[in-house]
Design a protein with these regions (language model features):
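Hydrophobic structural segments
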Residues: 1-247
Length: 247
């Protein structure tokens, strides 16, 4: 498949042109024209690129790519090394950020809900769905369940939360800023990837459980689902690589 055809295929599936994002979605660094072997991962880190080189990949597809708004345009150090690896080895880099958060089938939010057994009921605002657990559980039990499903112990704050958690809102990655919207909506718990200092105060003062389960851990689902979709719908050789990241 041509690299431009792969871009068009994913763009159409994820409806990527409809998003105003923090960076470009699609083909970010052009490599060889023909693509057959693809490595996917959460972030285009040097470790992921090195694995792509080791496996003679034609392309890398990630959720966190390059060229974010307001980042320095200077190419030196870590940024130089990453781009040099791609260009010297003629590897294409594709990045899909918000389109891979929001997709109703492959998106990070939907995939996290499926992993945790949450039935999606609706959306509080864009990128912030809410839903219900199959049965109410204590806050500590939900923390243990999140750890079991994601392989990472979440930071949990439940000082003033209800005895049992049933209604849950969530936003994968760095979604802690949505906690106030979730509280106003009236959920029992809010799950995201990251935590800020003020997040805990918001949780305590508004009476809900808060779980920071890891930016990386909560956003493996989308790129993994996209990998599976490509495998099922094309003849491409696609391999998801999980580069460990505790953050």
């Amino acid at each position: 498949m041509k690299n431009s055809e792969l871009e068009s295929l994913i763009n159409e599936k994820l409806n990527s042109t409809s998003f105003s994002d923090y960076g470009p979605n699609g083909l970010q660094v052009e490599g060889r024209e023909t693509v057959q072997k693809i490595i996917t991962g959460v972030t285009a880190s040097q470790a992921l690129l090195d694995e792509a080189v080791r496996q003679n990949a034609d392309a890398v597809i990630v959720h966190h790519g390059y060229f974010w708004k307001n980042e320095s345009p200077i190419i030196r150090g870590m940024k130089r090394n990453r781009l040099k690896t791609l260009l010297a080895n003629d590897i294409n880099l594709y990045g899909y950020h918000l389109p891979l958060d929001a997709h109703p089938e492959l998106g990070n939010n939907v995939q996290l809900a499926q992993l945790l057994g949450i039935t999606i009921m609706g959306e509080i605002e864009p990128l912030v769905p809410w839903g219900e657990l199959a049965m109410p559980v204590p806050g500590l039990e939900l923390a243990s369940w999140i750890e079991a499903r994601l392989g990472r112990r979440p930071l949990w704050s439940g000082d003033t939360g209800p005895d049992l958690v049933k209604r849950v809102a969530w936003c994968t990655g760095g979604g802690q800023g949505f906690i106030d919207s979730a509280a106003r909506f009236g959920v029992d718990a809010f799950i995201t990837g990251e935590v800020s200092e003020q997040t805990i105060h918001s949780a305590r003062e508004q009476g809900l459980h808060f779980y920071a389960a890891g930016h990386h851990a909560t956003e493996r689902g989308g790129i993994r689902a996209l990998s599976e979709w490509l495998t099922e719908n094309t003849d491409l050789d696609v391999t998801f690589i999980d580069i460990p990241n505790p953050a």
